[in-house]
Amino acid sequence: MTSRLRVLIADDNPRVVKSVSRLLALDHDVVGSVTTGTLLLEAVQQLRPDVIVLDLTLTDGDSLGACREITQRNTATRVILFSGDDDPEIRRRALEAGACAFVDKLFGADLISAFRCLVPGNAE
């Protein structure tokens, strides 16, 4: 039996939020979703998620900066950066900002694999 992670989704596209929620809800607890970086920082403090699925391009700000701030303040919270742009430079910058994974939005299986690596007792 695997542990259910508390997941917060940060994406400004409601269809993406709905799809990711459905994908993850079978094995994890989606505790909330937000559409802006400002709301994200507030939600992290209130909801205390284990994992954040963070869109690279939130409309109100710098997702990489938010990732950096979250991982520095909340060392137990992990961030998976989620983007439709698989540019190696962006991937590098995401990992430098503290993301534990960078996942292409087009491949849901990659997101599931990233979560499997986060659950204690699972190895890939």
Role assignments for model-derived ranges:
Residues 14-32:
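Two-component/phosphorelay signaling modules centered on CheY-like receiver
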